[in-house]
Amino acid sequence: MPAGGGLWRGPRGHRPGHHGGAGLGRLWPAPHHAAAARGAVALALLLLALAAAPPCGAAAVTRAASASPTPGTGATPNDVSAEASLEEIEAFSPGPSEAPDGEYGDLDARTAVRAAATERDRFYVCPPPSGSTVVRLEPEQACPEYSQGRNFTEGIAVLFKENIAPHKFKAHIYYKNVIVTTVWSGSTYAAITNRFTDRVPVPVQEITDVIDRRGKCVSKAEYVRNNHKVTAFDRDENPVEVDLRPSRLNALGTRGWHTTNDTYTKIGAAGFYHTGTSVNCIVEEVEARSVYPYDSFALSTGDIVYMSPFYGLREGAHGEHIGYAPGRFQQVEHYYPIDLDSRLRASESVTRNFLRTPHFTVAWDWAPKTRRVCSLAKWREAEEMTRDETRDGSFRFTSRALGASFVSDVTQLDLQRVHLGDCVLREASEAIDAIYRRRYNSTHVLAGDRPEVYLARGGFVVAFRPLISNELAQLYARELERLGLAGVVGPAAPAAARRARRSPGPAGTPEPPAVNGTGHLRITTGSAEFARLQFTYDHIQAHVNDMLGRIAAAWCELQNKDRTLWSEMSRLNPSAVATAALGQRVSARMLGDVMAISRCVEVRGGVYVQNSMRVPGERGTCYSRPLVTFEHNGTGVIEGQLGDDNELLISRDLIEPCTGNHRRYFKLGSGYVYYEDYNYVRMVEVPETISTRVTLNLTLLEDREFLPLEVYTREELADTGLLDYSEIQRRNQLHALKFYDIDRVVKVDHNVVLLRGIANFFQGLGDVGAAVGKVVLGATGAVISAVGGMVSFLSNPFGALAIGLLVLAGLVAAFLAYRHISRLRRNPMKALYPVTTKTLKEDGVDEGDVDEAKLDQARDMIRYMSIVSALEQQEHKARKKNSGPALLASRVGAMATRRRHYQRLESEDPDAL
């Protein structure tokens, strides 16, 4: 080692530590990763270094710079005090320094720290552990003996699992929605006092003869309630066939048809209760589902049918469960349904089941159970599956693509004992044949005539079909030709021979056929070439398996030994041990036999290191770690010290007596910051140090990610129930929108209702009553129209304004007339001759100017004018009295007096004057 010492660094990302007094010792790493082998090697090197490393010199010599700059020529000037020369530097800008080697003295600390910071080297704040979270070292465990696999067989496999998914099929439900509404009719309003809704089934004959033949439905519903047969008519009218129209809205996977959008409500004469009936024929195509043991099925409407969907009248299906009377079920062969949207008949016939329940009729296509359902479901296909026989007498199936192994007995599974397991061989053969044609058709041959089925642990069923390479198959063929058995055993001989040699015959399988009646056929290999090839293959296989078994056992023993090292190191530096074990930055302290930990928080704000490590105001006292300031989560500037491995301490308690010839290197970011005599000098890059990493030159295996191997997906688990309640709620909320128009408002005209009632009354009187009714209805209609016109005119704002103005004008005229009459009564002369009376009033009247004779004449004239007015009134009364009936009576009386020779007397006496 050179006299100046050497700057040693541990592997990248490891926690450094220092050894020695005033001189600079070696910086050795503590474990950082969780890998047990790497941790053990690092700990062993650390213990050896601490025990055997000699002390180094005080000077740190690097490969890049020949000499260190003197204090005062670096970042801090001599003529500035320690407090004034605190140059805060930021350590977050990545990228190496652009300054050449040897010129670090001309750079400030800010530039050097920026050049050292990288993305991987971040700063952390570690709170002290409180003990709420503890970690224990795993105790030693007994190492298992890994059995070696032997007799490997390559092939293609298909994995099956238990089928938890329900059996789904399409079904049609037919029902008539009967709504009976009772309404109280008022003079200007209508109120619903009762509403009764019921679903009634559609007869099967109507479905087959009307709905599935002409796309129509009868507007009449006949059903049984309270053990009585009742009938309902749509709109209380005679039944007719109504076209089925598509529903307004449909949920996903469902369709619907109905006959009407409206609910009939009868609004009759005012003051009475009226009842109206609405019959809406509805056909819905829904999803039905049934779960094992398939003794009932549920519809997406929420209805449950208590019978097996596989119940039928042929092929033994009558043994399935049914919970209804036989008369409610009907099966129709060669049935041709129609598409209610296009009105097209199906091209192929089906066997359709019909079941009439108290509230609906359900129909679905029947098929045997064995063709529709299976108790096992295909899970995964393994194009490369390896089967090996373990020493405990079991088969181990390993799939590299799946990253999983399945262990089973050597005895094949008898699928006849598996209920509804006929699909396994069929689906497995189809999948294996497809994989073989796509991948192995030119390089391998299939062994056997069908897949071998095994029950693996965990309830999985493995359908395995061995593969033989073409070269090996040719060797088998040559051996058979040599023995003269090629024509006896046929093309399946290579697979049989390979199975007979490599694995014992499974229990319960049929014995091989006898040859010439002398015993069982036993095929052996006699070719030396084949034997050598087989021996070489078996030898290499056994050697590799034995080596892998030893490595596995040694790995387990190494884990137990590493536990002792971890336990001892946890007493020296629990934080480093916990960080390496957990794989994330934590702070730890021992609590007896366990470690209390707290997670370190990454500092995302700026981190600044100060140039001086001397304590201001205290001579002879210095800080043992550099001073830093940083920001964290917007809390402002925090003052602290730089801890080990980029840890930021929130206190400044680490002090020591100042010593001469002080030289220290501290980890900062991805490099090291160098202090001399407690002053910053420069930044030391990682490439300038000597690495203690011992590189192991090996070719590693390819990286492999282990992902969760889901047996049942979330969708499969959510779809296991008999009822899908979310779908039921969605359907119930959508029912009114599908089959009824909720936006349409029917406005009732009470006049029309009155005329309709009068018309119905006269129509009940026959033809004469109908004729009279037309006349009466015409007159009534005219009156209603006139009144309606007036009401409409008055309801118009302009009409109401005009009427108001006319009324106001009449009131003003009446007031003026009343005032004029009052003036006439009070002072007639003033009212008749206002000018004359006004002049007399202004000029005044002297007694000498009045002519008494003219005054008497004026009085006489006024008196005679009054007499003339009275005579005219009497004459007017007389004429009015003699007009009409009075005049007729006077005329008759005059005729009678004339016949009796009476003469009229003079009404005035000529001698009276």
UniProtKB/Swiss-Prot annotation:
Any one Pfam family match given in the protein's UniProt record, by short name: Glycoprot_B_PH1
Source organism per UniProt: Suid herpesvirus 1 (strain Indiana-Funkhauser / Becker)
The name this protein goes by in its record: Envelope glycoprotein B
Chief subcellular location: virion
Transmembrane segments: 798-818
Low complexity bias locations: 496-506
Assembly: Homotrimer; disulfide-linked. Binds to heparan sulfate proteoglycans. Interacts with gH/gL heterodimer.
Record note on modification: A proteolytic cleavage by host furin generates two subunits that remain linked by disulfide bonds.
Region of interest (Hydrophobic membrane proximal region), residue spans: 742-795, 752-795
Listed GO CC annotations: host cell endosome membrane; host cell Golgi membrane; host cell plasma membrane; membrane; viral envelope; virion membrane
InterPro entries: Glycoprot_B_PH1, Glycoprot_B_PH2, Glycoprot_B_PH2_sf, Glycoprotein_B_ecto_C, Herpes_Glycoprot_B
Positions occupied by motif Internalization motif: 902-905
Virion surface compartment residues: 60-797
Glycosylation sites: 151, 261, 441, 516, 633, 697
Disulphide bond pairs: 126-600, 143-556, 217-281, 374-423, 622-658
Region (Involved in fusion and/or binding to host membrane): 183-189, 268-275
GO biological process entries: symbiont entry into host cell; virion attachment to host cell
Localization per Swiss-Prot or TrEMBL: Virion membrane; Host cell membrane; Host endosome membrane; Host Golgi apparatus membrane
Signal peptide (UniProt feature, chain positions): 1-59
Intravirion side stretches: 819-913
UniProt lineage: Viruses, Duplodnaviria, Heunggongvirae, Peploviricota, Herviviricetes
